[in-house]
C-alpha cells in the first residue's frame, strides 16, 4: 500500500540526515498517515480512509461529503 494521503495527495519526500560533523546521508520524510473511519450520514455507513493529519483538518473544515466527492472524482473507489 502506498504512503499517500487520500485527501491531500501528500506522499514521501526525500532529504538528508545531517550529522554534527556535517555528513549527509539520504533519508525519506514520511507523511503522518492514519487509518480513520468517518461516518457518512448521507450514505448511512462508515468510510475508512488513509489520511494525513492535515487531511483530517480539511475534512473537519469542509465536511466528509464534500471531500468524498473530490476523492471519487479523482477515480478512487471509496
From Swiss-Prot:
A Gene Ontology molecular-function term?
structural constituent of ribosome
Q: What is one GO biological process annotated to this record?
A: translation
Which Pfam families does this chain map to?
Ribosomal_L28
Record flagged with keyword Oxidoreductase = no
**Which keywords accompany this UniProt record?**
Ribonucleoprotein, Ribosomal protein
Task: Report if keyword Transferase is assigned.
Answer: no
Q: Where is this region: Disordered?
A: 1-20
Q: Where is the signal peptide?
A: none
Gene Ontology CC entries for this record: cytosolic large ribosomal subunit
Q: Which PANTHER family match?
A: 39S RIBOSOMAL PROTEIN L28, MITOCHONDRIAL (PTHR13528), LARGE RIBOSOMAL SUBUNIT PROTEIN BL28M (PTHR13528:SF2)
The Swiss-Prot or TrEMBL record describes its family as follows: Belongs to the bacterial ribosomal protein bL28 family.
Q: What is this protein called?
A: Large ribosomal subunit protein bL28
This protein's species is Pseudomonas entomophila (strain L48)
| Name of the gene this protein is made from | rpmB
Amino acid at each position: 500500500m502506498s504512503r499517500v494521503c487520500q485527501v491531500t495527495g501528500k506522499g514521501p519526500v526525500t532529504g538528508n540526515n545531517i550529522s554534527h560533523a556535517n555528513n549527509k546521508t539520504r533519508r525519506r520524510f514520511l507523511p503522518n498517515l492514519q487509518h480513520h473511519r468517518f461516518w457518512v450520514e448521507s450514505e448511512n455507513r462508515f468510510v475508512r480512509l488513509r489520511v494525513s493529519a492535515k487531511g483530517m483538518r480539511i475534512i473537519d473544515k469542509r465536511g466528509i461529503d464534500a471531500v468524498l466527492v473530490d476523492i471519487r472524482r479523482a477515480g478512487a473507489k471509496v
